[in-house]
């Protein structure tokens, strides 16, 4: 209003400036970090037996087998983000989850916050606690870090927003995930920006679902656009009215049968949510359809079988439902159903970035349409229509009602976030009209024109095994980390059709993954003798030659691979890495920049650029690259380490060490070290490990890098094997080196585990058998018994007896 008046008084002008400045100051979002005591039913009893026989897909993680029946107060780190409209709470020590979120004008939770931390045996590793938003990456299930600390940083941004970035490595795939929880200064809701990248040269499993919780209540109605829902198998069913006439979009009509998973599909839309009809508030999620098409509802059974989980997971907060957003249509579990749904792979050296919004609604009756900037609900009567609006931002603009795409009504409104605006107009029920609110990116039409033409059923297909169907099945196995199954299927295909170059390429990749480089190059060479220009075969050949140090043939093969747009950025990045290894830093920079032309966020290329510029003393360019990496991944440990290398002060050393905050810090130190080692930066690789926690695998790497054999025997003798789970293909050569230099059963045992994890079961069994009854450690015998079970009953029984 001040700006509409002519200002003549200087004093008043100064006062106006002060008032605006104060208003600007108070409109900033704020972020706080503090410890909070919460009633906790804790978990304990980590299991030292490798998970390889139980769930090899998540090795090297281990399970927790103890769960408290009684609670105690326990302190947790809380990151609180707040502006004038909402409060958001993050728990970096509990998987980085959003603990809950509150709409301040009503005090209602639009993200369910469980006031107790009640761990129960639900996740892949066991402990899981309900509520908030859980970030799941990697493989179907509650991710392995869901109950343990992850890395995090907090930021106060120039635009007045605040952010908490959480993230971790998914160890089996070695992919890196980050989620930025961002709260703008004048926004009724918050954003999450996910960054997930695959820094490996291999295909990895691809799974992402953001699992949010909301209170369960009989008046809850789900606004989830679509005309079908899919089961985990991909089987299609009717939505929202099922075959029995139940309206599944109403919580109270789900009072039948077991717990439910509804993956709702069929409509090209960007939002879904829920509304409590009697309480007058609700929650919602927004994300571009091309980024986050998956929308799932999880409902506990309303019988006692579901009700017991209210007692098991909460004390006084009541039952909850989950509304989940995913990168795919379905949380897919392979079964006998024939349909178009499948698992997919994460392409080598690729990165995915997407944004989502989580918001409250109040006093509007439901959600007919929503964007990241506002939500509307339409109420139709016989002779009139009511439009209810919640903006999430300051909104000074037009609401347009169109009939036959011609303006019927237009209103100018000036609203603040979470204002409730209602307009009633004369359009009879049954007449189609359109609502356009351009400034809020809302465009809604009462006749649904957003149903998609996509089949979710394959009833017309006859199940017939062909080489192509078997190949598709093998690719599914790779995406589901069933590498042994995939290998056998690919071998069968190649036996029947030696010209199936796709099968040859993937089989070579599996052998590379397993550290079997001779087998890998032999199979790939057979394919290249059929098709010398094949980009996939050349790419796999290139990474194999690079691994065995044949850089000429690696660069030659990668050059051909780079002609394909699929491999261009990745292949050029690998050539840049070889140039760095060969100490041709200018070439490393040149190839990295070429790689970035085709993927500007290629983390591997940016890493090579940072290291090369530092080695050339290009301080300004070095800093620019670190700034670029930080803009993509503020948690990346290379940032603090490279800064330490430039300025090796005590403060920078502490910053580097403290940047590793996750549960398994030894693994994040080792992952960074191996990255430098693979680039022939051996001094830096050793330095990283020396500054990290003491751990047998890491210490063996230190000895290997420095070729220090003198204290190797003492090192191994003085360390326990408990919770030492080597899994990287690079560590195989370290353990083989140690085995060749000392005689100690622990090295053989660790090598056997590493080989088993890579599908090299015969080699692993041989090592286990050769150890006979030499080890004096009960966990060795339990581990051998669990892995060798079924191969020899007498040996299994003997191992169990020795353990106990």
Model-derived segments and their meaning:
Residues 81-82, 88-107, 166-217, 356:
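Acidic, contiguous internal or C-terminal segments within carbohydrate-active enzymes
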Residues 468, 502, 536, 570, ...:
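Start-of-helix register in tetratricopeptide repeats
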Residues 367-465, 637-639, 700-721, 727:
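Long, contiguous interaction/recruitment modules in multidomain scaffold/adaptor proteins
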Residues 450-471, 656-665, 735-743:
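TPR-adjacent "capping" and linker segments in tetratricopeptide-repeat scaffold/adaptor proteins
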Residues 506, 540, 574, 608, ...:
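Canonical tetratricopeptide repeat
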Residues 32-42, 79, 97-100, 108, ...:
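A contiguous, surface-exposed recognition patch within enzymatic or periplasmic domains that forms
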Residues 520-526, 555-560, 587-594, 619-631, ...:
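Alpha-helical repeat scaffolds
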Residues 48-74, 78-82, 130-188, 309-344, ...:
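Extended, loop-rich substrate-binding clefts of extracytoplasmic carbohydrate-active enzymes
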